[in-house]
Each structure stands twice: as structure tokens, then as C-alpha cells.
Amino acid sequence: MDITKIVDKYFRPFVASAAAIFLIPWVLYLELVLPTHYEAYHWRGAWVGFDVGLVVFLAATAILGFLRSHLLSIAAFATGVLLLVDVWFDIMTASPHDRPTSIITGVCGNIPLALILMGIGIQIGRRIYQLAEKATLDIEHDL
């Protein structure tokens, strides 16, 4: 059996599964030991840096879309995930006074855009898989 097939079939899913399983105790540990209130340092840099990264991913997604690149599937999905992370932290770190605004902007802006981008990524990924599968069948048929 080809080593690439072994890695694809067994190793990659095992690594992701193991990481997910080992992360569970870590999350429980954090729930027990982290304070409910913490004064963050470099707050501005963290938020500005994250949003700059989000702009880069949005721009890359747009450029890859204009280029009709197969990499659009990955960029669109990743950008959608970043938008969901942005909403989560906007809401969780907002003061009680600002929380309604964070929820409204998340529900009306970030979440719909994230779902659209992730849907685009999934659709393109499925189509690429279908085309690759068809090409494999065509090659096998020609042999």
C-alpha cells in the first residue's frame, strides 16, 4: 500500500481525534482555575491584530474568488471560522452596556457572512472532490 494512502486513511484522522480528546481535560481544567475577571494587557494590539488578520483573510478570499482558484474553498471556510471567533470574543468580552450591540452586529453581520463563506467553501470542496473522483474513474476506465 502507498504510504500516502496510509497517512491519509489512518494518521491524519488519528491526530485530529487525539487532539480533540486530549483537549477535553484541558478545557475542564481551565474552567476550574481561570478567574471570571482578568485585566488584559495589550488589549488594543490583540484586537487590532486579530482584525488585521481578518481583513487579510477576507481580501485573500476575494482575490482567490476573482482568480477562480481552487484554494477559495479553504480561504472561504477559514475566513468564516475567523468571523465566528470574532463574534464569540466580541460578545464574551463586551461590557454589559456594549453586549447588546455586539450581539446585534454578530447576528446581523458576522454570523450570516460566516455561514455564507463556510457554505461556499464546502460547496467548492465537494465539487473539487466530485471532479477528482470522476477523473480517477475516467483514468481507470482508460487503462
Residue ranges and their predicted role:
Residues 1-20:
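Cytosolic juxtamembrane helix and N-cap/initiation of the first transmembrane helix
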Residues 6-12, 33-43:
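Short juxtamembrane and helix-loop transition motifs at transmembrane-helix boundaries
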Residues 21, 45-63, 78-85:
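Core segments of alpha-helical transmembrane spans in multipass integral membrane proteins
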Residues 28-37, 88-97:
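Juxtamembrane "helix-exit" motif on the non-cytosolic side of transmembrane helices
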Residues 39-48, 97-109:
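Non-cytosolic membrane-interface motifs at loop->transmembrane helix junctions
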Residues 51, 73-91, 110-116:
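Hydrophobic alpha-helical membrane segments
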Residues 59-73:
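Juxtamembrane helix-break-helix junctions at the cytosolic face
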Residues 111-136:
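Membrane-water interface at the C-terminal end of transmembrane alpha helices
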